[in-house]
Amino acid sequence: MVAPQFVLRDTEGTVHGPDEWSRAQAIVIFFTTIDCPLSNSYVPEMNRIRQTYSDRGVAFYAVQTDTTIAEAEVRRHARDFAFSFPVLIDPRQSLVQLAGATATPEVAVLSKSGKVLYLGRIDNRIEDFDKRRSVVTESDLRNALDAVLAGRPVPHARTPVVGCGINFLTQEKKP
């Protein structure tokens, strides 16, 4: 299997593609949308996880899943929420399809060849849409990354996600 063969531009205009992805030990995709409060609440934690793992060869990207949101709004959202990693514009939902994501905030860990090694929640903080744990007891994304970087299989390759459903390509893009 080879790295995904498409290129995507981020909100700052930088193009990301196969050459970049093939150099990573693992690729984390954070599926998000600007109007999902659960997804927005996870940006600080995703920034912390990126800070911990990026020096170990893990590449981090967020993907705006709602293709009807204007790019200027996505750019504003990325800046307002202080993402510390690129927010990709994916007009064909290529990464959503590759990973099989269905909700935000959902994360995928991909191998450098594009194989989905983990798909699911970041941790177990969110029990239900309006119910959160005061203490996280399962750090699923961190556990998956630790396993991948150690060359071990991910113990729980799929975990359930509580979040906002992804709107799949059926609507016209807003100006």
Where are these regions (language model features)?
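N-terminal "domain-start" segment that seeds a small globular fold
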Residues: 1-19
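Short active-site neighborhood of thiol/selenol oxidoreductases, capturing the structured segment around
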Residues: 17-41, 60, 145
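Loop/turn elements at helix/coil->beta-strand transitions in domains of secreted/extracellular proteins
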Residues: 24-27, 56-59, 83-85, 104, ...
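Structural recognition of the beta-strand scaffold that forms the well-ordered cores
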Residues: 29-30, 59-64, 86-89, 109, ...
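Short, thiol/selenol-centered motifs that function as redox-active sites or metal-ligating centers
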Residues: 33-44, 67-68, 107, 164-167
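Structural microenvironment flanking redox-active thiols in thiol-disulfide oxidoreductases
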Residues: 40-81, 88-98
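Thiol/selenol-based redox catalytic cores and closely related redox-interacting motifs
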Residues: 91-171
